[in-house]
């Protein structure tokens, strides 16, 4: 009897593992629990305001009154038929040129400091430090620098230039001066992106090229730039978007007056100074569409390289 009971106990099927089912379900749910809060915040603070902005662009809302009337495409017609509203995009050309100069300078410094250079850590900090500063602080520093008789004029006197130049008052120099400030402030971001990308290029490629007698400019042009092309493409997208959405530096330094008014400054003034929130919303929608369109064109012209699957 004892041997029979032992054999029957051994041949009995093991009990079903019901306890393993809940952990397996939790493994499927856990990633969504981690994503829930960021997704809720993203929808609440990004997509809902965008949808509200688009809906406001079809109304004549003044931003204060609870009443708003549907006006259809009238706000968009005003933007494209009133030259004083849409022509301010021309100011962005100065910042667009400055963004390409900024990318070129950042790429140059990243390439130089990626090789064996003395005091590399010091120069990296000097280049990246302006990006850490608050935009308002940067604007006030350069406001003092550019004022008549300010620091820049005093430096020019040391080299023999005795005339006081209206850096912000001269329409021919104001946007050049302001775009130069943006180059100084944002070059550090592109510099860090390029430096990290260059350092990720395999060192074997550098060594093989140097053994073949390639110079550093040749290594830069034929090895480094093709290897970091996705990062360069990202910097171009960020530069174009930044050039079209410039606000704080010209607004603080000149108040966005005259030829220094940008599209974003005009949009803010329409909403909060002239109480034309509907028209300002339409302007913001147009700016969003322009940036998305330029990004799409850029991605089509410079497609992302895909590594072949093995």
Language-model-derived ranges and their functions:
Residues 1-19:
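Short, intrinsically disordered terminal tails adjacent to the first/last structured region
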Residues 14-27, 309-310:
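Alpha-helical transmembrane segments of integral membrane proteins
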Residues 27-310:
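A structural signal for multi-pass alpha-helical bundles of membrane permease subunits
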């Amino acid at each position: 009897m004892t041997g029979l009971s032992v054999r029957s106990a051994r041949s009995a099927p093991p009990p079903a593992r019901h306890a393993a089912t809940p952990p397996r379900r939790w493994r499927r749910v856990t990633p969504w629990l981690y994503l829930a809060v960021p997704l809720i915040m993203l929808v609440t603070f990004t997509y809902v305001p965008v949808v509200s902005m688009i809906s406001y662009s079809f109304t004549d809302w003044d931003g204060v009154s609870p009443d708003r009337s549907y006006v259809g495409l009238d706000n968009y017609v005003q933007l494209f038929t009133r030259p004083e509203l849409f022509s301010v995009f021309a100011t962005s050309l100065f910042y667009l040129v400055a963004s390409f100069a900024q990318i070129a300078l950042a790429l140059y410094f990243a390439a130089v400091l990626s090789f064996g250079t003395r005091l590399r850590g010091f120069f990296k900090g000097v280049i990246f430090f302006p990006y850490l500063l608050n935009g308002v602080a940067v604007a006030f520093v350069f406001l003092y620098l550019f004022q008549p008789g300010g620091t820049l004029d005093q430096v020019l006197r040391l080299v023999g230039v005795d005339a006081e130049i209206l850096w912000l008052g001269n329409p021919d120099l104001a946007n050049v001066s302001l775009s130069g400030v943006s180059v100084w402030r944002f070059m550090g971001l592109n510099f860090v992106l390029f430096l990290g990308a260059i350092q990720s290029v395999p060192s074997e490629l550098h060594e093989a090229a140097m053994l073949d007698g390639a110079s550093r400019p040749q290594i830069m042009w034929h090895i480094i730039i093709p290897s970091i092309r996705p990062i360069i493409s990202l910097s171009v997208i960020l530069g174009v978007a930044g050039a079209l959405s410039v606000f704080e530096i010209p607004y603080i330094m000149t108040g966005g007056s005259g030829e220094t008014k940008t599209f974003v400054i005009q949009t803010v003034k329409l909403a909060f100074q002239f109480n034309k929130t509907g028209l300002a919303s339409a302007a913001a929608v147009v700016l969003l569409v322009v940036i998305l369109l330029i990004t799409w064109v850029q991605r089509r012209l410079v497609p992302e390289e895909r590594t072949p699957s093995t």
